[in-house]
Design a protein with these regions (language model features):
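Non-catalytic protein-protein interaction segments used by genome-maintenance enzymes to assemble
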Residues: 366-419
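Acidic, metal-coordinating catalytic cores used for nucleic-acid/nucleotide bond scission
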Residues: 205, 226, 245-255, 273, ...
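Terminal amphipathic helices with adjacent charged low-complexity linkers/tails
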Residues: 101, 342, 347-375
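Non-catalytic accessory segments of DNA primases and related replication-initiation nucleases
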Residues: 1-120, 124
Length: 419
């Protein structure tokens, strides 16, 4: 207790209060600092700078969220409820995900102004336009939460017309950046404490649909490609990642991009390829829970998926295409660490294309040798010990913050306490 650290003698994990919360809650170190700050009444920004002023942003979005939810269950919300019912979204699911409704006849802007929020602030946070009117009108509202479970944005979907954009999202703000948000993270992380596998999808309706059949370890990228910020979050969430994007060409492109980003994280990646260009929402509606779970349980491992992708646009009646495919496959296999998987795939290449096994193995060994020689030529990166890193961080904050610079007066403990 005196040292403010912990050690688990069972699994060997150790660290301080921040690393403990990060590991337990499956969140990044930065989010752990911010979460603990909120617990003790300190507002920690995304750059870990401390502010004593209460941020109105979360209050506004929390108030707006309740307003939209209440609007859905009024007489003016009957058509929206019927629409959701036809989409097999029941009231329990509506409440679980905080789904609401924006209504033209009932102004959110006026409601929030009566709550003493300024019009400038409402424009700034993306709920009101420059003319003082609501951004969202006659749309089913899906709140978007940050990693700590605070509502920070909305996605509004049309339900009674086809003459406008299907979805409208809150503009990006300091608190809402798509590249840092994973839809349903705040709910999914609770299920991941028991299930060490997260399913990544593209859209919020995919996640909601999965939840309606009891599959709650799903998150979504809000329709964007995975980012480096997402990568850091996902790495801490689970040891097993299932990519289940849409079954069309765009979904396949997103899958390949996600693999390239996550491949060096050490997580076990599996891939689901849904048939008939269906997305998870459509697939579950059409085929049901058991069929979808079968897709998840039979997901391809990383090397099998890559081998299938390499076959695209290849004519295996053409010798050059066969040679091109085999060489590309071998280049993928040299990165595989499991020798059994390597041997099985080498044998499969030999059998499928009637090529002598020793010829395949010889080519593989040459590629391995060349790879080792290239690695040998690369100079090792300069590394820093913990004291060097601490010094670098101190210099960084001295340059960034004049208050820190002024505090460097020989009292190192005081400075470290601030950082």
């Amino acid at each position: 207790p005196e040292k403010q650290i912990y050690t688990c003698f069972s699994c060997g994990a150790s660290g301080n209060v921040f690393t403990f919360v990060a590991d337990f809650e499956k969140i990044s170190f930065t989010e752990a600092v911010r979460l603990l700050g909120e617990k003790v009444g300190i507002n920690i920004g995304t750059n870990i700078s401390v502010s004593n002023k209460k941020d109105e942003y979360f209050d506004i979005y929390s108030t707006a969220n309740k307003f939209y939810q209440n609007s859905l269950f009024t007489n003016l919300g009957k058509n929206a409820i019927e629409y959701l019912d036809k989409r097999h979204i029941d009231k329990d699911t509506i409440k679980k995900f905080g789904i609401g409704l924006s209504i033209q006849k009932v102004s959110l802007t006026e409601y929030l102004i009566n709550k003493k929020y300024s019009i400038d602030k409402l424009v700034d946070v993306g709920l009101t336009n420059e003319n003082g009117h609501d951004i969202f009108i006659n749309r089913i509202m899906f709140p978007i939460y940050d990693l700590s479970g605070n509502p920070v944005a909305f996605s509004g979907r049309i339900y009674n017309t086809k003459d406008t954009a299907k979805y409208v999202n809150t503009k990006e703000t300091d608190k809402f950046k798509k590249g840092k948000i994973l839809y349903n993270y705040h709910i999914a992380k609770e299920y991941l404490k028991k299930n060490d596998s997260v399913i990544i999808m593209e859209g919020q309706m995919d996640v909601i649909r999965a939840s309606t059949v009891g599959i709650d370890n799903c998150i979504a990228t809000m329709g964007t490609a995975l980012t480096r910020e997402h990568k850091s979050i996902i790495r801490n969430m689970a040891n097993n990642v299932v990519l289940c994007f849409d079954g069309d060409a765009a979904g396949e492109k997103a899958t390949i991009s996600a693999i390239e980003l996550l491949e060096d994280t050490g997580v076990n990646i599996k891939i689901v390829r849904l048939p008939d260009n269906l997305d998870p929402d459509e697939y579950i509606l059409k085929n049901g829970k058991d069929s979808f779970l079968a897709q998840i349980n039979n997901a391809s491992n990383l090397i099998d998926y890559k081998m299938e992708i390499l076959k695209k646009n290849k004519d295996f009646g053409n010798i050059k295409d066969i040679s091109s495919y085999v060489n590309s496959a071998l280049k993928e296999l040299i990165n595989e660490k499991d020798n059994i998987i390597v041997e099985l795939n080498l044998k499969k290449l030999s059998d499928n294309f009637n090529i002598d096994y020793e010829t395949i193995k010889d080519k593989y060994n040459k590629l391995i040798k060349n790879k080792k020689e290239v690695v040998r030529d690369i100079k090792p990166k300069k590394t820093y010990n913990k004291y060097g890193m601490a010094e670098n961080y101190l210099i960084y904050y001295m340059l960034k913050n004049e208050k820190v610079l002024n505090m460097v007066d020989g009292n190192e403990k005081r400075v470290i306490g601030v950082l």
